[in-house]
A protein has these predicted regions:
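Residue-level signature of catalytic and energy-coupling elements of molecular machines
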Residues: 47, 114, 174
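Short glycine-rich, Thr/Ser-proximal phosphate-binding strand/loop in the N-terminal lobe
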Residues: 96-113, 118
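Phosphate/pyrophosphate-binding loops at sites that engage ATP/ADP/AMP, CoA/4′-phosphopantetheine
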Residues: 175-181
Length: 181
């Protein structure tokens, strides 16, 4: 995703919105956000498997910016931020913030679960998650995965089972908050 940070007309001062201004030269400062497509597809599959449809992914910055313009929102919506240390659920209704909850368990727990399940260091667990992790065991093709910095391997489906279990727990917390709404 590409997000504009500011604009300058005719090399002038940076402004937030150039609409309605005239000039010969428009400069745009922007920020580029990248995401792992396979990771997003896994997360989308988990949401859809839980019965949640119409899922769109944005960097947190864009999501919060969109949420701040809630007066133009045509429908009620929830903003879910799956963070490393916690999950934030923010609910908007009729253009206003209605409910906000913080769940004190985040996606970093996937690393600690992987450490415990396979007797790995934090670094090894994190590397395995980022290189080979899948959140849906049912679509995981089983293969041997090399454990970083060792000659040992583990089954990809075993890793997917650990990741899926924690992701389901995180999403259950989100769904509970949505049901309270």
């Amino acid at each position: 995703d590409i997000l504009p940070v500011g604009y300058a007309i005719d090399r002038g001062e940076m402004i937030a919105d150039p609409l309605g201004r005239s000039g010969r030269n428009l400069e745009v400062t922007y920020q580029v956000y990248l995401a792992d497509y396979d990771y997003l597809a896994d997360i989308q599959g988990l949401f859809e498997g839980s019965g949640i449809q119409e899922i769109e992914f944005y960097p947190a910055v864009r999501a919060y910016a969109e949420a701040l313009d809630v007066e133009r929102a045509e429908r009620d919506f929830a903003l879910v931020d799956l963070g490393a240390m916690g999950v934030n659920v923010v609910l908007f209704r009729d253009g206003m913030l209605e409910y906000e909850a913080h769940l004190p368990i985040g996606v970093r727990t996937i690393d600690t679960d992987t450490m415990a399940a396979f007797a790995l260091s934090f670094g090894q667990a994190r590397k395995l998650k980022h290189e080979y992790g899948q959140a849906l065991r049912s679509i995981c093709k089983n293969k041997k995965l090399p454990i970083p910095d060792t000659r040992l391997t583990l089954e990809s489906r075993d890793l997917a089972t650990v990741i899926q279990s924690r992701c389901e727990e995180l999403l259950e917390g989100v769904i509970f908050q949505l049901q309270q709404w």
